[in-house]
């Protein structure tokens, strides 16, 4: 490849006058960085909680305990500190569906949605064999050693006695009182609904007189004015008073029957919620 150079002959010099732009200048836009948008958190508007049915394995009973678990509307599995929670035990010859049938969880939905009570978790286990008392049955041990740890490991519940309650109706109330006074370091609140106590259970209540005041559970007792076990319930209340146990006793119109308990499930929830608030404020 050859490069050939050519030169112009007798050419006139070319003037080098700079060109001037006479057009109107346009404003120059400077890019402005866009602000990072913060995602708007989703607002939960649910008005109903959810009910789970789970089988919790137990070593004491060598079988599982079928358990209904109520999670409140807008349940947050990562809630800081966890929800206060309540174990509710059914009566003799019934199942763990009893509290559902009485309307307990429907009442919880209404009271939580209206902000009358704080959201809480409710645990309703099934006692299959209900004939033995605490000396013969290991149901109480299974609750303490298997059910309670399972709930605290798998659900967003508070792990302090001030936000842990146990209650029940009739025989279930017997278990609640038994566990509440045998393990006052675990449960800060006990509910006994239409509850004549297990034989010998008054001794555990009398023993509470020697506990520091902050270690004694708050107790709710109620019964119908026509309850066939009313006298035994009154003996229970007298024992609480003599032992210096903080309690509230309500006598409503009614008998020892489902229509009585269903009429007062909202009252029970209000009381448990107030008790949680009281214990938390005293910490």
PLM regions: where:
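Non-catalytic cap/lid and distal C-terminal segments of serine-dependent acyl enzymes
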Residues: 15, 19, 31-283
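Short, conserved catalytic or interaction motifs in soluble domains
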Residues: 8
């Amino acid at each position: 490849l050859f490069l050939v150079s050519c030169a112009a002959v007798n050419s006139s010099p070319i003037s080098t006058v700079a060109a001037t732009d006479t057009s109107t200048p346009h404003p120059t836009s400077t890019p402005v960085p866009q602000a990072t948008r913060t995602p708007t958190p989703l607002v939960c508007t649910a008005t109903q909680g959810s009910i789970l049915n789970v089988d919790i394995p137990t070593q004491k009973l060598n079988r599982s305990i079928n358990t209904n678990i109520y999670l409140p509307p807008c349940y947050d599995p990562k809630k800081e500190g966890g929800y206060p929670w309540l174990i509710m035990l059914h009566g003799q010859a019934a199942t763990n569906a009893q509290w559902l049938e009485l309307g307990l969880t429907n009442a919880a939905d209404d009271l939580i949605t209206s902000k009358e009570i704080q959201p809480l978790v409710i645990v309703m286990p099934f006692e299959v064999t209900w004939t033995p008392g605490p000396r013969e049955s290991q149901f109480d041990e299974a609750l303490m050693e298997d059910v309670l740890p399972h709930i605290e490991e798998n659900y967003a519940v508070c792990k302090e006695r001030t936000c842990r309650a146990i209650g029940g109706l009739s025989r279930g109330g017997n278990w609640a009182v038994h566990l509440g006074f045998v393990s006052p370091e675990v449960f800060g609140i006990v509910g006994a609904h239409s509850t004549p106590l297990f034989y010998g259970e008054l001794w555990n209540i009398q023993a509470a007189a020697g506990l520091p005041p902050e270690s004694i559970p708050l107790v709710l007792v109620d019964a119908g004015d026509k309850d066939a076990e009313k006298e035994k319930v009154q003996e229970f209340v007298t024992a609480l008073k003599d032992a210096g146990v903080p309690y509230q006793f309500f006598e409503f119109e009614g008998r020892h029957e489902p229509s009585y308990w269903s009429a007062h499930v909202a009252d029970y929830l209000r009381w448990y919620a107030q008790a949680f608030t009281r214990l938390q404020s005293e910490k």
